[in-house]
Amino acid sequence: MNKSFLLIQKLSKSFRDGNEKITVLKNINFSFEDIKIVSLTGPSGSGKSTLLHLLALLDNPDSGKIIFNNKDLVKSEDEEKTDLRKNDIAIVYQNNNLISDLSAIENIALANLNKNKDKKKSYLLAEKLLKEFGLENRMNHYPYQMSGGEQQRVAIARAIINDPKLLFADEPTGNLDRKNTDIILNYLFKLKKNNRLIIIATHNRDLAKKTDLRLTLSNGNVINKS
C-alpha cells in the first residue's frame, strides 16, 4: 500500500478562551504504512477528540497537512470535503447522534440515501447491516426504544454503510457497561479490512491493547507510539 494513505504533517490547533489562546495540538506528525486499527489514548483534554475532528474534516487546523491518497485535504474546497464525508470518511460519537424521530433502519439508510438517492438499495443495505449487527428485531425501533449498546451498534452501522476508507470513533464505549462495551469492540474489530483505517479515541486500556498501533497524546503532543 502507498505509504501516504494517511499522512499527518505538523498539524496544530488552538482555541480562544476570551483573550487567552489555548493550544490543543502542537505539530502532530505521524503516518500509516499499513492499514491498521489505531487507538488514541491520553488524559482528558490531551487533544484526542480535537484530532479526530480534524481528521474527519469537521474542523480546520491552524496549520499543517492531512494527506489522504496523496492529496492534502486541508486545502480541499468545502464541497469536496462534503463528498469525502459522504464516501470515504465516517465518524462514530460517544453519544451516537442518532436522529430521534427515525427508526433504526431509517437512521442507517439515510446516510446512504445522501450518497446514491436509491431508496430501495439504501434500505436493503441498511437491513443487511442490521442483521450483521444482531439487530434484525430492532429495525423499526426508535432510539428511545433501544438500549445504549443497541443504539451504538446502529450508529456504527450508519457510519459504515458507505464503506468508508477512514473510520473514526470518539470514545464509542464511553457510556456503556462492560457487556455492551465488549459487544461494540467485537463489532469494531470485525470491521478491519483491506483499504480501511480505523482510529479509536479511548480511555479503555483493554481496547487499546488489542489495536495494531497505540498513540498516546499528552498536552497536544504524541508522546508514545507502540
Question: What residue ranges belong to the model's regions?
Answer:
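A short, proline-enriched helix->beta-strand linker immediately N-terminal to the Walker B motif
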Residues: 161-165
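Short coil-to-helix segment of the ABC ATPase nucleotide-binding domain corresponding to the Q-loop/switch region
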Residues: 102-111
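The feature captures the beta-strand-to-loop junction immediately N-terminal to the Walker
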Residues: 41-43
